[in-house]
C-alpha cells in the first residue's frame, strides 16, 4: 500500500456490484454458444429400481432427489443439479452418446431420452435451453463479471498510484525528463 494511509479495496466484490454491472452492460452480453440445464443418469441395466428411477429423474422433486442420492452408489454417473447452466459443447463432451452430428436429436426441453446399451441405461433430459444470440443469465456470467470488476479496480489502482507518484515528484521537484 502507498504510504499515505489510504485503504485500498480491490478484491471484495458484492452481489449488488455484480448485478449492477450486469444490468448496465446487458446489451454487451450475447451468447456465442447454446447453454443448457440438464439431468443425466447412467445406471446399470439390471438395476431393480429402474422404473422408479425413470419416473424420478423426469420429475425430480426434493423427495425424488433424496431417493436418487440414496442410490447414488448404484449409478455409473449421476448429474441432477439442473439449476446450473452448461455450455452445449461441455455437455456433448461429457455424455458419450451425444455428439455434434446427433445433438439436435437430444435437445428438446423436458423430454426424457432413454438410451440403452449392453450394460447401462442412460437417462438424459434438458430442463432449459438458451440458444446462441440470446442474453446469458447472470448466474452464467457471475464469476466472469466479478473478475472484470476486480481487474478494472486493479487498473484504476495502478493509474492512481502512477498519478500520485508523478504529482509527488512534481511537488518536490525530484524528477528527470528523458528525451
Predicted regions and their residues:
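Peptidyl-prolyl cis-trans isomerase
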Residues: 1-179
Amino acid at each position: 500500500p502507498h504510504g499515505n494511509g489510504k485503504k485500498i479495496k480491490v478484491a471484495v466484490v458484492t452481489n449488488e456490484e455484480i448485478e449492477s454491472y450486469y444490468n448496465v452492460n446487458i446489451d454487451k452480453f450475447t451468447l456465442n454458444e447454446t447453454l443448457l440445464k440438464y439431468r443425466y443418469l447412467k445406471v446399470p441395466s439390471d438395476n431393480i429400481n429402474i422404473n422408479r428411477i425413470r419416473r424420478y429423474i423426469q420429475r425430480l422433486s426434493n423427495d425424488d432427489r433424496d431417493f436418487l442420492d440414496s442410490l447414488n452408489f448404484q449409478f455409473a454417473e449421476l448429474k441432477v443439479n439442473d439449476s446450473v447452466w452448461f455450455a452445449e459443447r461441455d455437455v456433448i463432451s461429457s455424455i458419450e452418446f451425444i455428439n455434434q452430428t446427433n445433438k439436435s436429436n437430444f435437445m428438446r426441453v423436458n423430454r426424457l431420452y432413454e438410451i440403452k446399451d449392453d450394460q447401462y441405461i442412460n437417462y438424459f433430459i434438458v430442463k432449459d435451453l438458451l440458444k446462441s444470440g440470446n442474453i446469458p443469465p447472470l448466474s452464467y456470467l457471475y464469476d466472469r463479471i466479478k473478475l472484470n470488476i476486480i481487474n478494472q479496480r486493479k487498473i484504476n489502482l495502478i493509474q492512481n498510484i502512477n498519478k500520485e507518484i508523478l504529482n509527488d515528484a512534481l511537488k518536490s521537484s525530484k524528477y528527470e525528463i528523458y528525451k
